[in-house]
């Protein structure tokens, strides 16, 4: 006759004085152990079901500041840096046409015209010549540099015959994470432009960058101190 398979239930040896080779296992001990095992398995199953079917946590909202901050800047071409440089790359050599490139850089002043801020630097790609408006439409990609405060980058339509709005695509320094838009007001193309920035996503701007602007007109000029970049009339480490 085949020997019976050994039981999976472990048993302990009989204590001295007990009869038989093994001690008897009390049924209630086995039942209690099985109940504990079933309880653990049940809790695990409930946890798995909860993780599978419970709603996902909501995506946290954008924590960046939503307040709109205005900043005013004048861009003035003082004809001292061979800007703009017009590169005729289109097939039409007698008039402005699609594909012409215009790299440029000009000086930046505060909206109050009493402080030198830095420079603009970028490129315009001619998209359309508009003879009935005696002007052109460009796609512009450029940056505004503000010394130790960092820079702002923008992109969008640059119209030589009327105002336009460009997107603020980012920045560095105090402008890191900035977004919003900037209104470009052509005063005298390509020599005087007035910008109104509507910035979001950043902490409060430094007081040095805030001002009450001089109303734009063809006759506006920076103060002599700002033009001479005297220490009290320019940003620290401004780009020249």
Swiss-Prot record:
Pathway per the UniProt entry: Lipid metabolism; polyunsaturated fatty acid biosynthesis
Pfam hit, one: Allene_ox_cyc
Upper lineage: Eukaryota, Viridiplantae, Streptophyta, Embryophyta, Tracheophyta
Other remarks on this protein: 'Hebiba' means snake leaf in Japanese.
Domain of life: Eukaryota
Main location: plastid
Native source species: Oryza sativa subsp. japonica
Gene: AOC
Family from the record: Belongs to the allene oxide cyclase family.
GO annotations of cellular component type: chloroplast
Result of knocking out the encoding gene: In cpm2 and hebiba mutants, impaired jasmonic acid biosynthesis. Flower morphological abnormalities and early flowering. Slight increased susceptibility to incompatible strains of the blast fungus Magnaporthe grisea with higher hyphal growth and impaired phytoalexins (e.g. sakuranetin) production. However, normal sensitivity to compatible strains of M.grisea. Impaired jasmonic acid accumulation in response to wounding.
Annotated catalysed reactions: (9Z,13S,15Z)-12,13-epoxyoctadeca-9,11,15-trienoate = (9S,13S,15Z)-12-oxophyto-10,15-dienoate
Induction: By wounding and jasmonic acid (JA). Up-regulated transiently by salicylic acid (SA), ethylene (ET), abscisic acid (ABA), and hydrogen peroxide H(2)O(2). Also triggered by chitosan (CT, a fungal elicitor), heavy metals (e.g. copper Cu, cadmium Cd and mercury Hg) and protein phosphatase (PP) inhibitors (e.g. cantharidin CN, endothall EN and okadaic acid OA). Accumulates at lower levels in darkness than in light conditions. Follows a circadian rhythm. Induced by brown planthopper (BPH, Nilaparvata lugens).
GO MF term set: allene-oxide cyclase activity
EC number: 5.3.99.6
Protein name (record): Allene oxide cyclase, chloroplastic
Function: Involved in the production of 12-oxo-phytodienoic acid (OPDA), a precursor of jasmonic acid (JA). Required for the production of JA in response to wounding. Necessary for flower and coleoptile development regulation by light, including blue (BL), red (RL) and far red (FR) lights. Involved in the auxin-mediated signaling pathway leading to growth stimulation. Essential for photodestruction of phyA upon activation by RL and FR. Implicated in responses to salt stress (NaCl). Confers resistance to incompatible strains of the blast fungus Magnaporthe grisea, jasmonic acid (JA) thus playing a significant role in the resistance to fungal infection. Implicated in riboflavin-induced resistance to the sheath blight Rhizoctonia solani. Required for Pseudomonas fluorescens WCS374r-mediated JA-dependent induced systemic resistance (ISR) against M.oryzae.
InterPro entries assigned: Allene_ox_cyc, Allene_oxi_cyc_Dirigent, Allene_oxi_cyc_sf
Annotated keywords: Auxin signaling pathway, Chloroplast, Isomerase, Lipid biosynthesis, Lipid metabolism, Plant defense, Plastid, Transit peptide
BP GO terms, sorted: auxin-activated signaling pathway; circadian rhythm; defense response to fungus; developmental vegetative growth; flower development; induced systemic resistance, jasmonic acid mediated signaling pathway; jasmonic acid biosynthetic process; photoperiodism, flowering
